Amino acid sequence: MSIYGDYIKSVIRTVPDWPQPGVNFRDITPVLQNSAAFRKLIDSFVHRYQELNLDAIAAIDARGFIIGAPVAYELGCSFVPVRKKGKLPFKTISETYTLEYGASTVELHSDAFREGDRILVMDDLIATGGTMLAAASLIQRSGGQVVETATIIDLPELGGAQKIRDAGHGVFAVCTFTENE
């Protein structure tokens, strides 16, 4: 957890029963609307990764882009979007993963990384871990090395962070939310 974790958590809005009954949606838009909170959020990642000589940030469509791009800028490394299927114009590689009710596919450009590139994978939230694991697989298949996965929010009760750790990847979350928070 970040030194700013409690503060960031206090700014995140919980929207009950959205997008469906029984779901507590963790809304990061109040963080984005508050310049001090957004700066602290980005600084949380920059301070953690500034000495790791990353080659790129691979951020997941779409909310991962919001944090991935400024972190890449601050660290002086490249930014690579991991997109939903059919959104990239050049030759891609893809990875399909299972969801609670079905499957989804993410892609990245086939030339996104060079062999041995050191990559940080970023998204806004880890729930079941499927999207993050699919992105990590794409990176490894393209020759990149996943240094760690990073997120604003971890929902530990859904088990995603543990699945990511079990697959051999580190997980950094600025804050965590239990279901009852």
UniProtKB/Swiss-Prot annotation:
InterPro entries listed in its UniProt record: Ade_phspho_trans, PRibTrfase_dom, PRTase-like, UPRTase/APRTase
Molecular function GO terms recorded: adenine binding; adenine phosphoribosyltransferase activity; AMP binding
Any one biological process term the GO annotation gives: adenine salvage
Lineage: Bacteria, Pseudomonadati, Pseudomonadota, Gammaproteobacteria, Oceanospirillales
Keywords from the named record: Cytoplasm, Glycosyltransferase, Purine salvage, Transferase
Name of the protein described by the UniProt record: Adenine phosphoribosyltransferase
Broad EC category: transferase
Subunit organization: Homodimer.
Record Pfam families: Pribosyltran
E.C. numbers: 2.4.2.7
Catalytic activity: AMP + diphosphate = 5-phospho-alpha-D-ribose 1-diphosphate + adenine
Entry superkingdom: Bacteria
Xref: Gene3D superfamilies: 3.40.50.2020
Annotated family: Belongs to the purine/pyrimidine phosphoribosyltransferase family.
